[in-house]
């Protein structure tokens, strides 16, 4: 498809078979597609979301292997946030002229599409912004002009291979669990979890993360269940909210809770193809932690961008049409 004819073609993501094929199609591009896969899976496995939308720059619904172009982009929209993934994200090479034009066109089309969809959401406000998450460093310069507020500082994405590989087995069996009680988070823990987070999260949201969490407890505490370290898998598939009580640091509880969370997820559901997390430069301890955590690798830079879809969506729509 010529760049001037490029379009975001809808994917019937509400169809179970098509949704499964969509995830399977993206898996060979892991870990670069992890943000998009995680967000899509969460909205497919939880209560069905009629507002989940997906597109590709080729006709995914009627594709064959020979028809998938080398350069393509897939995109996802949910009421909370969106994702973009370009096949060229996997390349260490600089952005080519062809790729630059492709990405620029995709971003413009996505802003227009998101603008239209946001206006259909319950509780829509005229001045709404829309969060585009885990924006790859190759996409960021093209997304930035559409931002409302200043984008977040860059986040480094860290990823870990699948639980059934040899490298992760070393991590999972690393710290000794015998001294500690390992559980998931519980309702009574949520206020503490919220109060220790750098990000504002509701109790309602944290409650949905209980099944995807791990919590290390001190059996020698007064009630025998004091939570001293925890981690959860977020809605987009990332591992986050990692916290270790200051009184218990230096005991490798961070590494323990990461490995236990991955194990619990593998026991309770289909194991993730990749585990991943992000860290900003303003949390150097977090970055240092993952840099030294066996089995984990530092990846590329990403950003979280709040698109001013009302302002820029109308402008872009006029420019395209």
Kindly give the residue locations of the regions a language model identified.
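Short amphipathic alpha-helix that is part of the acyltransferase structural core
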Residues: 2-38, 164-203
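Acyl-donor-binding surface of acyltransferase catalytic domains
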Residues: 42-177, 302-319
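A structural microfeature
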Residues: 73, 227-229, 299-300
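Conserved acetyl-CoA-binding loop-helix of GNAT-fold acetyltransferases
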Residues: 99-120, 250-267, 288
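Conserved active-site alpha-helix within GNAT-family acetyltransferase domains
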Residues: 137-148, 269-270, 281-302, 313
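A conserved beta-strand-loop-helix scaffold within acyl/acetyltransferase catalytic domains
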Residues: 201-247
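Conserved hydrophobic beta-strand within the GNAT/NAT acetyltransferase core sheet
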Residues: 239, 274-280
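Conserved glycine-rich acetyl-CoA-binding loop
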Residues: 241-256, 284
């Amino acid at each position: 498809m010529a760049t001037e004819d490029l379009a975001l073609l809808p994917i019937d993501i509400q169809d179970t078979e098509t949704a499964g094929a969509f995830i399977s199609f993206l898996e060979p591009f892991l870990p670069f597609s992890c943000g998009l896969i995680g967000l899509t899976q969460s909205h497919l496995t939880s209560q069905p979301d009629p507002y989940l939308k997906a597109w590709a720059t080729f006709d995914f619904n009627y594709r064959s292997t020979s028809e998938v172009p080398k350069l393509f982009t897939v995109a996802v929209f949910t009421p909370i946030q969106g994702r973009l993934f370009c096949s060229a994200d996997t390349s260490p090479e600089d952005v080519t002229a062809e790729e630059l034009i492709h990405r620029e066109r995709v971003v413009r089309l996505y802003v227009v599409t998101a603008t239209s969809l946001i206006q259909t959401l319950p509780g829509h406000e005229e001045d709404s912004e829309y969060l585009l998450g885990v924006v790859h460093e190759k996409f960021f310069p093209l997304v930035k002009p559409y931002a409302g507020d200043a984008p977040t500082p860059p986040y480094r994405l860290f990823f870990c291979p699948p639980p059934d590989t040899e490298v992760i087995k070393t991590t999972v069996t690393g710290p000794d669990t015998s001294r500690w009680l390992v559980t998931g988070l519980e309702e009574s823990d949520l206020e503490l979890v919220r109060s220790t987070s750098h990000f504002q999260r509701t109790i309602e949201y944290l409650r949905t993360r209980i099944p995807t969490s791990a919590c290390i407890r001190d059996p020698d505490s007064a009630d025998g269940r004091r939570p001293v370290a925890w981690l959860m898998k977020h809605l987009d598939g990332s591992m986050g909210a990692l916290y270790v009580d200051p009184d218990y640091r230096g005991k490798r509880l961070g590494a323990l809770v990461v490995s236990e969370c991955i194990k619990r997820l593998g026991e309770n559901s289909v194991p993730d193809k990749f585990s991943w997390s992000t860290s900003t430069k303003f949390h150097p301890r977090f970055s240092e932690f993952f840099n030294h955590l066996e089995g984990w690798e530092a990846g590329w830079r990403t950003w979280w961008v709040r698109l001013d879809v009302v302002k820029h969506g109308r402008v872009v729509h006029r420019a395209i049409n």
